[in-house]
Design a protein with these regions (language model features):
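Short glycine/proline- and acidic residue-enriched helix-loop micro-motifs
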Residues: 9-11
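Glycine-rich phosphate-binding segment of PLP-dependent enzymes
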Residues: 50-69, 83
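Conserved N-terminal alpha-helix of the aminotransferase class I/II PLP-enzyme fold
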Residues: 69-102
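Short N-terminal amphipathic alpha-helices
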Residues: 36-41, 55, 68-71
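Aromatic-anchored helix/helix-loop segment that forms the rim or "lid"
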Residues: 14
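PLP-dependent class I/II
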Residues: 1-7, 17-19, 24-27, 31-38, ...
């Protein structure tokens, strides 16, 4: 008799990490179902609804029957609108034929890697940095290699460490500005220096700029795209999720070198086929009619950032950097704790505050936690008070965090 053979998870899939954000959220939801109050500082999602014009555009598209397949690259109208917007916002002429629409930003990052990285080639990514970079590089059978950000200088790019990480097997560098989780931004001189390194070593740069509109203190975002020439290998990644509070719409895009457009379109044809047309209509409405809405949302984020920064600065047990963009704080815990993972669990179970441990963002995130201020000021203030209470309790060493 032939024994039943169980389906075994592949080696590649075994190497992928699960999202820490959703894991913490799941635990928090279980606690809430049991009647416990949880203050949510873990998920990186704007607590706003999309601009009304977006929903109206989607309704109209559905009423018109735009519910069938459309072009894999994305409808022409949206690509033209993105090109116009990006030309104006980033200060460089964009060809609509270089724009590709995907369901969120992750697929365009994944497809860029799939279309340009061969097995065994190395891809550099920031540490601390967005937790999916390492998994996506692993998924395409590349070799993920972290480079450090200098926390003592506002999480600026550590070029000494970056240079040591580059070798003959290096194929690409991922950058993220503003940064998740640190909120830091790469400066113009850093971007120019990075571009020179990429030119010298013939490296691809993947620039994740999904937080580029969420900037504070009247500063302007500087994109590496501002300095590229036709010969540079640079991919720009952006999304509607954060800018327009459209996380559930799953709408992102990439602006790519001409050589990568056809390979990525092939990957789309063989995977999700296309982004629904009615969702893309919402994207057009967001760009055309949502700019004042974005300004108001960013103003509210800045108000929260300033208030929470005041509260965090009063906590002796941490060191905190004031974020320039995005909606995260990434404080370092300066007392003796087993790990940020253990502390985050202790904080959730005993004080009802959900946040993310810094280890989820790389080795350099040890003893850090990520605090999302995408929540009401009332909840944020309450959560920070509990955060402080937990730190004081740990410092006294009278409470076990095991």
């Amino acid at each position: 008799m032939i024994k039943d053979k169980k389906v075994v998870e592949s080696q590649v899939c075994q190497k992928l990490t699960e999202s820490a954000s959703f894991a913490v959220l799941a635990t928090a939801k279980r606690m809430e179902r049991s009647g416990k109050e949880v203050l949510h500082l873990e998920i990186g999602e704007p607590d706003f609804s999309p601009p009304p014009a977006v929903k109206e555009a989607v309704y109209k598209s559905l009423e018109k029957g735009e519910t069938h397949y459309t072009t894999p690259q994305g409808i022409r109208e949206l690509r033209e609108e993105i090109a116009r917007y990006e030309t104006e916002f980033r200060g460089v002429e964009i060809d609509p034929d270089r724009v590709i629409i995907t369901p969120g930003a992750k697929p365009i990052i994944l497809f860029t890697l799939l279309s340009s990285i061969d097995p065994g080639e190395e891809v550099l990514y920031p540490d601390p940095g967005y937790l999916s970079y390492k998994s996506l590089i692993t998924f395409v059978v590349g070799v993920p290699v972290p480079y450090h950000l200098n926390k003592n200088e506002g999480f600026s790019l550590d070029f000494d460490h970056l240079s040591k990480q580059i070798n003959k097997n290096t194929a690409a560098i991922i950058i993220n500005s503003p940064s998740n989780p640190t909120g830091s931004m790469l400066k113009e001189e850093e971007l120019k220096r990075l571009l020179e390194i990429a030119r010298e070593r013939e490296l691809l740069i993947i620039s994740d700029e999904v937080y580029s509109r969420i900037i504070y203190d009247n500063k302007s975002h500087v994109s590496i795209f501002k300095f590229v020439t036709e010969d540079d290998k640079v991919v720009l990644i952006d999304s509607f999720s954060k800018t327009y509070a459209m996380t559930g719409f799953r709408l992102g895009y990439g602006i790519l070198p001409n050589e990568l457009v056809r390979p990525i379109v092939k990957l789309i044809q063989n995977s999700f086929s296309c982004v629904p047309q009615f969702i893309q209509r919402g994207g057009i409405a967001a760009i055309v009619n949502g700019q004042e809405y974005v300004k108001a949302m960013v103003q509210e984020f800045e108000r929260r950032r300033d208030r929470i920064y005041e509260l965090l600065k009063e906590i002796d047990e941490i060191q905190v950097h004031k974020p320039e963009g995005a909606f995260y704080f990434f404080p370092e815990i300066r007392i003796d704790i087993p790990s940020a993972v253990v502390f985050a669990q202790y904080l959730l179970e005993n004080f009802g505050v959900a946040l993310l441990p810094g280890e989820a963002f790389g080795e350099q995130g040890q003893k850090h936690v990520r605090i999302s201020f995408a929540n009401s000021l009332e909840i944020l203030e309450k959560a920070i008070r509990r955060f402080k209470e937990a730190l004081v309790a740990c410092k006294k060493s009278t409470i076990s965090m095991s």
